[in-house]
Amino acid sequence: MKRYTPDFPEMMRLCEMNFSQLRRLLPRNDAPGETVSYQVANAQYRLTIVESTRYTTLVTIEQTAPAISYWSLPSMTVRLYHDAMVAEVCSSQQIFRFKARYDYPNKKLHQRDEKHQINQFLADWLRYCLAHGAMAIPVY
């Protein structure tokens, strides 16, 4: 089987697109603890600023509803690099570090291009939220 070679220009293009789309969904204030919620079809999502520095912002994205008793709801952590204008998934579903490539087969059953796939998933999710989502605005 041919060894997988990451396509770096494609990965950077994907991360740049994720950065521009994710910025449109983030809370206006980038202080840690700030959150914003979205309703997309019958699902609810929450974006929370975990950390904000001069050059980076760390965001968690969690599905909060509908709750399914036998399945954990999707969540991921994304780091935005403001100087490079890219956003990259740092962790997802208890996987806390993604390698650029994995040998296959491997003990944890990661795909050879797991890092690219999880960032592509973020891109697809962002595109879907921007096309079909509505912001949940609290009424006081």
UniProtKB/Swiss-Prot annotation:
InterPro entries given in the database record: DUF1249
Listed name of the protein: Uncharacterized protein YqiB
Gene that encodes it: yqiB
